[in-house]
């Protein structure tokens, strides 16, 4: 399946990749429609980031077309779309020893399960590899707070897809993100070389970033600002 087709398929989850609404109706209707869209968007984000995931280890996969990998996992047929830089990283016909962080995007009539990115070479170490400080703040309202504690990562390398997913799931479970707390907010993942990643909590991580790989020991800290 081509990238565009898979992207269209995910629209069934709701307006998941944008928090904006373009409208030319009168202001009263516009406000009502915006509220409705935001509520639907928030519920879709909650469903996505609390859905079923699988951490598939030591996978053997075959290249399928220009930008896909295919393999079987416990009898399930899996197809991984390779976004962004992954297209150039995976040029061989076959691969051994891959780890895949699976989040289902689609299931077709042939019982093939589709996911995007989340592929790295098999991690060889076990236990905690990195523990950057996770600073979380909510600055406004009666429930304002500031907290900081180590965030344990048990992989030498981790995709931005997996880190984004697990951070949001942590925020959902511990702080009510997308439930009692607004979906507005940002996450900044700072690396020791001065570079960083910004995540917008109002929208799902874009497909093109789901293949980004981060050396976990190079993560300096993670800042979360909730609104």
Curated annotation (Swiss-Prot):
Residues 1-30 form the signal peptide. It is found in: Secreted. Pfam families: SSL_OB (PF09199), Stap_Strp_tox_C (PF02876). Keywords: Secreted, Signal, Virulence. Transmembrane segments: none annotated. Its main location: secreted. Plays a role in the inhibition of host complement activation via the classical pathway by interacting with the Fc region of human IgG and thereby interfering with the IgG/C1q interaction. Also inhibits the penultimate step of plasma clotting by interacting with prothrombin/F2 and coagulation factor X/F12. Does not affect the protease activity of thrombin but interferes with the conversion of prothrombin to thrombin. Interacts with human receptor CXCR4 and specifically inhibits CXCL12-induced calcium mobilization and cell migration. Belongs to the staphylococcal/streptococcal toxin family. NCBIfam families: PRK13038.1 (NF009596). This is Staphylococcal superantigen-like 10. The lineage of its organism: Bacteria, Bacillati, Bacillota, Bacilli, Bacillales. The gene is ssl10.
């Amino acid at each position: 399946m081509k990238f565009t087709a898979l992207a269209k398929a995910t629209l069934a989850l709701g307006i998941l990749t944008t928090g904006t609404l373009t409208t030319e109706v009168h202001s009263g209707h516009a406000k009502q429609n915006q509220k409705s869209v935001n509520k639907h968007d928030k519920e879709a984000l909650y469903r996505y980031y609390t859905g079923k995931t699988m951490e598939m280890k030591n996978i053997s996969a075959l290249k399928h077309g220009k930008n896909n990998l295919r393999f079987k996992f416990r009898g399930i047929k899996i197809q991984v779309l390779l976004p962004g830089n992954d297209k150039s990283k995976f040029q061989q016909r076959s691969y051994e020893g891959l780890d895949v962080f699976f989040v289902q995007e689609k299931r077709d009539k042939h019982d093939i399960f589709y996911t995007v990115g989340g592929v790295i070479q098999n991690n060889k170490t076990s236990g905690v590899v990195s523990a950057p400080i996770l600073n979380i703040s909510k600055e406004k309202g009666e429930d304002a707070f500031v907290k900081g504690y180590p965030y344990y990562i048990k992989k030498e390398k981790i995709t931005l897809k997996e880190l984004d997913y697990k951070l949001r799931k942590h925020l959902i479970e511990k702080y009510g993100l997308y439930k009692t707390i607004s979906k507005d907010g940002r996450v900044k993942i700072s690396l020791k070389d001065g570079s960083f990643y910004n995540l917008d909590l109002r929208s799902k991580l874009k497909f093109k970033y789901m293949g980004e790989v981060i050396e976990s020991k190079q993560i300096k800290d993670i800042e979360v600002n909730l609104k």
